[in-house]
């Protein structure tokens, strides 16, 4: 990832999504990322499986966040997608660090290199 600026693009910043669960966020992301060539087949199942095994919710001072991602094999082109849901979406806390987190911002990392 030599050009970090290319990771952040306006086309991958989304506001006011009506999503009640992480699965709904992931399904909407797949609908945006797949047609643009950012993800490979199987991404949706992979991100759900990884989130179940390794939750990504983080309680932060300014805004609670979640940082879902999957294995590099499901990323066709590196990216960072940002979702600001209309209402917070509950994610389990990272590394079992407390209660579930009401994420106000979801930052999906598409990392193609381990």
Where do the model's predicted regions map?
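Cytosolic covalent-transfer regions centered on His/Cys nucleophiles
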Residues: 1-114
């Amino acid at each position: 990832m030599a050009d970090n600026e290319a990771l952040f693009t306006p086309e991958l910043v989304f506001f006011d999504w009506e999503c009640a669960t992480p699965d709904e966020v992931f399904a909407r992301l797949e609908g945006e990322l797949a047609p643009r060539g950012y993800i490979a087949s199987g991404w949706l199942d992979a991100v759900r499986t990884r989130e179940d095994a390794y939750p990504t919710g983080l309680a932060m001072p300014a805004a609670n966040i979640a940082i879902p991602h999957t294995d590099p094999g499901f990323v066709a082109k590196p990216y960072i997608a940002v979702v600001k849901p209309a209402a917070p979406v509950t994610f389990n806390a990272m590394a079992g660090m407390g209660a579930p987190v009401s994420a106000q911002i979801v930052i999906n990392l598409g990392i193609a290199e381990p």
